[in-house]
Structure formats: C-alpha cells, structure tokens
Curated annotation (Swiss-Prot):
One of its GO terms (biological process) is defense response to fungus. InterPro entries: Antimicrobial_frog_2, Frog_antimicrobial_propeptide. Expressed by the skin glands. Belongs to the frog skin active peptide (FSAP) family. Esculentin subfamily. Antimicrobial peptide. Active against a variety of Gram-negative and Gram-positive bacterial strains. Active against fungi. Shows strong hemolytic activity against human erythrocytes. The lineage of its organism: Eukaryota, Metazoa, Chordata, Craniata, Vertebrata. Pfam families: Antimicrobial_2 (PF08023), FSAP_sig_propep (PF03032). The keyword S-adenosyl-L-methionine does not apply. This is Esculentin-2MT2. It comes from Amolops mantzorum. Keywords: Amphibian defense peptide, Antibiotic, Antimicrobial, Cleavage on pair of basic residues, Cytolysis, Disulfide bond, Fungicide, Hemolysis, Secreted, Signal. It comes from the Eukaryota. It is found in: Secreted. Disulfide bonds join 70-76.
Length: 76
C-alpha cells in the first residue's frame, strides 16, 4: 500500500510539472501570435499608405503636366 501511494504521488507531481510546462509553452505561443498579428496590421497599413501615396503622386503629376502643357500653348 505504501509503494502504491508513493507511485501515485510521483505520477501526480510529474503530471503537474508537465501540465505547467505545457501552459508556459501555450502562453509563449499566444504571445508570438499577437506579435504576428501586429506585424500583419503594420504591413497592411504600410502597403495601403504606399498605394495611396502613389495614386496621389500620379494625380499631382497629371495635373502638373496638364498645367505645363496649358502654359506652353498659352491656353490657360
């Protein structure tokens, strides 16, 4: 009976230790996931800003070229 109690106690402690290690890994994985999401949102905002910036520059370039052509032809 005494050896059975020792064995059960040993299994209980080993199970508790392995469970705590699994929880630590899980929390570490969740932290990595948050970093990945933040990185994903930042890259999305960065891409959108580039797209908007390029379109604004194209529009400004077209308007500038039209204005220069107008001045060159004295049609303004």
């Amino acid at each position: 009976m005494f050896t059975l109690k020792k064995s059960m106690l040993l299994l209980f402690f080993l199970g508790t230790i392995s469970l705590s290690l699994c929880e630590e890994e899980r929390s570490a994985d969740e932290d990595d996931g948050e970093k990945e999401v933040k990185r994903g949102i930042f890259s999305l905002i960065k891409t959108a800003a580039k797209f908007v910036g390029k379109n604004l520059l194209k529009q400004a370039g077209k308007a500038g070229m039209e204005h220069l052509a107008c001045k060159a032809n004295n049609q303004c």
